[in-house]
């Protein structure tokens, strides 16, 4: 069987992102999202779960955008003089203290579990989990909280070796220049047996998103493609089963 998890990263970043997640669930092929727990609209998770009962919610561990959930004094190697996460991943974490990384990751996990939705998995913003200072803590926390994880080409080998539950295939090229309907149809046409995740970032683009994210207008295009009737029909015609990470629990 071919199982497909289309996951929307960045839930909670803006209202427009959350609205895009709902749209792609109700009228498209999206069945999973991951929450940026340090962002202002993360709290909408429960409300949106009620609108989208089969939507899975994961944790989008964030170490290079916005402010930490921990007090800046506790994670001073992660933040700048204003108390925001240092920008410029991966080098922004090169001098980060591993114990401070652990503190912040666990704060974000605890926040996710407090939102009132079942947490299906864990992944990370800009694939921060793959950083040498992060990967061991990421694995440790996945074990501690019994969470399946996304595995990327940068960290798949170590995640598999650690014995964590993860997808069989991870597709990351439906992004930026790859945000084209024909590209998504090609990806769907070459799906392998097992469980595949396609990373996505759909949204309704508003001023708030334009001001805080350099990846903006393409999110609107992603949204229209993920709800396209030809894409929906392809899924039906090829017996692809839409899922979220709870399939791995």
Swiss-Prot record:
Family annotation (Pfam families): YdjC
EC number in record: 3.5.1.-
The residues that hold Mg(2+) are: 60, 125
Q: Which GO terms describe its biological process?
A: polysaccharide catabolic process
Q: Which GO terms describe its molecular function?
A: deacetylase activity; hydrolase activity, acting on carbon-nitrogen (but not peptide) bonds, in linear amides; metal ion binding
What class does this enzyme belong to in the EC scheme? Answer: hydrolase
Listed A to Z, the keywords are: Carbohydrate metabolism, Hydrolase, Magnesium, Metal-binding
Where are the membrane-spanning stretches? none
Query: What subunit structure does UniProt give?
Result: Homodimer.
Q: Which family does it belong to?
A: Belongs to the YdjC deacetylase family.
* UniProt-recorded name of the protein: Carbohydrate deacetylase
Q: Which organism is it from?
A: Thermoanaerobacter sp. (strain X514)
């Amino acid at each position: 069987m071919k199982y497909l998890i289309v996951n929307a990263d960045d839930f909670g970043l803006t209202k427009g992102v959350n609205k895009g997640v709902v749209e792609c669930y109700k009228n498209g092929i999206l069945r999973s999202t991951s929450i940026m727990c340090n962002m202002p609209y993360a709290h909408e998770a429960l409300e949106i779960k009620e609108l989208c009962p089969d939507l899975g919610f994961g944790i989008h561990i964030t170490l290079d955008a916005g402010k930490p959930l921990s007090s800046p004094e506790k994670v001073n190697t992660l933040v700048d003089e204003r108390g925001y996460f240092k920008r410029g991943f991966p080098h922004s974490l090169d001098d980060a203290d591993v114990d401070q990384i652990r503190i912040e990751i666990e704060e974000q996990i605890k926040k996710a579990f407090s939102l009132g939705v079942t947490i299906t998995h864990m992944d990370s913003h800009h694939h921060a989990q793959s950083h040498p200072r992060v990967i061991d803590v990421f694995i440790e926390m996945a074990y501690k909280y019994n969470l399946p994880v996304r595995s990327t080409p940068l960290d798949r080998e170590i995640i598999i070796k650690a014995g964590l539950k993860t997808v069989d295939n991870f597709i990351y090229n439906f992004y930026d220049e790859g945000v084209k309907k024909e590209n998504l149809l090609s990806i769907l046409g070459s799906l392998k047996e097992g469980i595949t995740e396609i990373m996505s970032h759909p949204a309704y683009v508003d001023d708030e998103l334009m001001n805080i994210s350099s990846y903006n207008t393409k999110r609107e295009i992603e949204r229209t493609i993920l709800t396209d009737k030809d894409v929906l029909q392809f899924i039906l015609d090829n017996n692809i089963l839409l899922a979220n990470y709870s399939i791995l629990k």
